[in-house]
C-alpha cells in the first residue's frame, strides 16, 4: 500500500474564507492542536510581499512564522506556500530548522520555466520544495510529461496533482496518478490537492490511499473542510479513515477542538461547502470563483448561472477573471430595448406626484400605520420593490431580479401593474417593460440592486418627492426582510460592502430626487 500522509492547509486554503484573519493566538493554537493530532505536514499560511499583519496567516519572513510554532514539533513538518511572482526570495533566509521545513510553490502553465528556477533557488537555501502546478488536471499528457521530466532534473521533495476546478472523478484521479507515478523519479513524493465541487474529495483520496506504490503521497485537507467555494477534504474525516483502515495513529480529538473553538465561529459568518453553483462550475470546467461571483449577485436562478458559465470561452474558464464574469453577466442580462414609450407611459402617472417606495425590509412590519396613512394621501403613487405587500394596494410593482421573480414573487389574487426590466420574461399581462442596462449602477457591488434601479428610473419620471420605507440596510442575520420567503443571506464582508456602496449611491441620488426615509434605515443619516 502507498504510504499516505495528511497535509493540513486550513490556515492557507481555508484562509480564503475569512481573509486569513485567524488571529495570532488562533494561528498558534490551530498549529499546536494539529501537531498534537499527529498531522504529518501542517501548512502555516502564505509567504507574500506586502505589509505584515500578525493577526493573519500571511507572512513576509520565515522568522514571523517561527513565532507561532510550538516548541515541540513532535512528528509534524511545517510548510508555507509561495505563489510564483508574489514573493521576493531576497526575504527568505536560509533554512536553520527554527521555522518551516518546506515551501510549496504554485504556478501557472505559462510560468513553468521561471517557476522551476524559483524552486531551485528555494531548494538551494535548504528548504524542502513542493512543486504545485495550478490545474494539473487540465494538462494534456504531453504537457504533464514534459513538466515531470523537468521536475526530475531538480528532484524536489514533492510533486503535486492539483484538481483546481474540482471536477475529477476516481478513474481520472487514478489515471493521472499512474501516469505521474510511472514517470516521476524515485525518491520524489507525490501530493494531491482536491476541491469538493462534486463531493468527491473524500472518495478520491480514499482511492489514492489504496493504490499500490512505494511512493509517499500527501493528501491535502482542511479542518471541517474549510476552503473557499465548495471547500476541501475534511482533515478529521481523512485522519479517522486512515486510522481505521491503515492503522494510522492520528489523534482526532485535538482536530475536533479546532472545529469547536475556531472553525464553527467562522462558519457562522462565512459559508463554504457543496452547492449547486459550484457543481455547475465543475461540470462546465470553470473556476469556482465564477460560480460564487454569479451566485452572490442574488439575482440569478440556477439555470441562468449555468447559461452564463457556458458563455465563458473555454480558454478563459480555468482562471477566474472578475472582468470576464461581469462582462458575461451583463451580456446575459442586457436584452437592450427602446423603452421611450414605456417611460412616457409611467411618467403620465407619476410626474408631479409623491411616490411611496416600499422596499422589502423588516421595518415595514413595525410601521404599517404610518405607511398606509401616507399611501392614502391624494397624489401618492405606491411602488413596491420585488414583492406584493399584503397590507396595502400598490400602483406598481417594480421587478428587475430574475431570482426574485422565480422564487418569491407572488401576486396572489391581487391585480397588479408590473414594471419589469428587459432581462426578465414575465407571464403577467399588465406589464410595462423598461430597459435593464440603462438603470444599472456604476459600482459592481450594487450594479443591479433593485431599490436603487427603481430610484434610477424615478430620476426620469419627475416625481415631486420620494418617500422610502423598508430600505433598512443589511445586517448579518435572517431578519433583514419583511417576509421570511424574501430572505437572501449575506456574510459580514458582503453586508459591509453593500451598505457602504448603497449609502454612497443614495447620496448621489439625493441630488436628483427629493428623498425622505419614513422607516428606520442605516442609510442617509
Question: What does each model-identified segment do?
Answer:
Residues 1-340:
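Catalytic cores and adjacent flexible loops of soluble metabolic enzymes
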Residues 337-525:
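Metal-ion/cofactor- or nucleotide/acyl-coenzyme-handling active-site neighborhoods
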Amino acid at each position: 500500500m502507498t504510504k499516505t500522509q495528511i497535509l493540513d492547509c486550513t490556515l492557507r486554503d481555508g484562509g480564503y474564507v475569512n481573509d486569513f484573519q485567524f488571529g495570532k493566538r488562533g494561528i498558534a493554537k490551530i498549529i499546536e492542536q494539529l501537531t498534537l493530532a499527529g498531522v504529518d505536514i501542517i501548512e502555516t499560511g502564505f509567504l507574500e510581499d506586502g505589509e505584515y499583519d500578525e493577526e493573519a496567516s500571511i507572512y513576509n519572513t520565515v522568522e514571523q512564522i517561527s513565532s507561532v510554532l510550538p516548541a515541540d514539533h513532535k512528528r509534524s513538518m511545517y510548510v508555507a506556500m509561495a505563489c510564483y511572482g508574489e514573493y521576493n526570495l531576497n526575504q527568505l533566509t536560509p533554512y536553520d530548522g527554527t521555522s518551516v521545513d518546506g515551501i510549496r510553490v504554485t504556478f501557472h502553465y505559462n510560468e513553468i520555466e521561471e517557476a522551476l528556477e524559483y524552486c531551485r533557488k528555494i531548494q538551494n537555501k535548504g528548504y524542502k520544495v513542493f512543486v504545485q502546478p495550478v490545474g494539473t488536471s487540465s494538462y494534456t499528457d504531453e504537457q504533464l510529461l514534459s513538466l515531470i521530466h523537468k521536475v526530475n532534473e531538480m528532484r524536489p521533495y514533492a510533486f503535486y496533482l492539483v484538481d483546481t476546478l474540482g471536477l475529477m472523478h476516481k478513474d481520472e484521479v487514478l489515471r493521472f496518478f499512474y501516469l505521474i507515478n510511472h514517470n516521476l523519479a524515485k525518491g520524489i513524493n507525490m501530493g494531491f490537492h482536491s476541491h469538493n465541487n462534486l463531493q468527491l474529495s473524500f472518495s478520491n483520496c480514499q482511492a489514492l490511499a489504496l493504490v499500490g506504490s512505494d511512493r509517499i503521497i500527501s493528501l491535502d485537507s482542511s479542518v471541517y473542510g474549510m476552503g473557499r467555494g465548495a471547500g476541501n477534504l475534511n482533515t478529521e474525516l481523512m485522519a479517522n479513515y486512515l486510522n481505521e483502515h491503515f492503522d494510522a495513529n492520528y489523534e482526532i480529538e485535538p482536530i475536533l477542538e479546532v472545529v469547536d473553538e475556531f472553525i464553527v465561529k467562522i462558519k457562522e459568518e462565512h459559508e463554504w461547502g457543496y452547492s449547486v453553483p459550484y457543481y455547475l462550475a465543475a461540470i462546465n470546467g470553470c473556476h469556482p470563483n465564477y460560480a460564487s461571483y454569479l451566485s452572490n449577485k442574488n439575482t440569478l436562478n440556477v439555470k441562468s448561472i449555468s447559461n452564463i458559465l457556458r458563455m465563458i470561452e473555454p480558454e478563459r474558464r480555468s482562471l477566474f477573471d472578475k472582468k470576464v464574469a461581469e462582462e458575461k453577466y451583463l451580456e446575459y442580462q442586457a436584452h437592450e430595448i427602446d423603452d421611450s414609450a414605456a417611460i412616457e407611459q409611467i411618467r403620465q402617472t407619476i410626474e408631479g406626484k409623491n411616490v411611496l417606495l416600499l422596499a422589502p425590509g423588516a421595518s415595514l412590519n413595525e410601521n404599517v400605520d404610518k405607511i398606509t396613512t401616507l399611501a392614502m394621501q391624494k397624489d401618492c403613487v405606491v411602488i413596491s420593490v420585488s414583492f406584493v405587500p399584503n397590507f396595502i394596494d400598490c400602483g406598481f410593482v417594480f421587478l428587475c431580479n430574475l431570482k426574485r421573480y422565480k422564487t418569491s414573487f407572488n401576486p396572489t389574487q391581487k391585480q397588479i401593474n408590473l414594471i419589469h426590466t428587459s432581462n426578465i420574461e414575465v407571464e403577467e399581462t399588465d406589464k410595462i417593460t423598461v430597459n435593464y442596462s440603462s438603470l444599472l449602477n456604476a459600482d459592481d457591488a450594487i450594479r443591479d440592486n433593485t431599490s436603487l434601479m427603481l430610484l434610477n428610473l424615478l430620476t426620469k419620471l419627475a416625481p415631486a418627492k420620494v418617500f422610502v420605507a423598508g430600505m433598512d440596510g443589511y445586517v448579518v442575520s435572517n431578519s433583514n426582510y419583511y417576509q421570511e420567503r424574501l430572505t437572501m443571506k449575506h456574510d459580514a464582508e458582503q453586508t459591509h460592502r453593500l451598505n457602504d456602496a448603497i449609502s454612497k449611491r443614495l447620496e448621489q441620488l439625493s441630488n436628483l430626487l427629493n428623498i425622505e426615509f419614513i422607516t428606520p434605515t442605516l442609510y442617509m443619516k
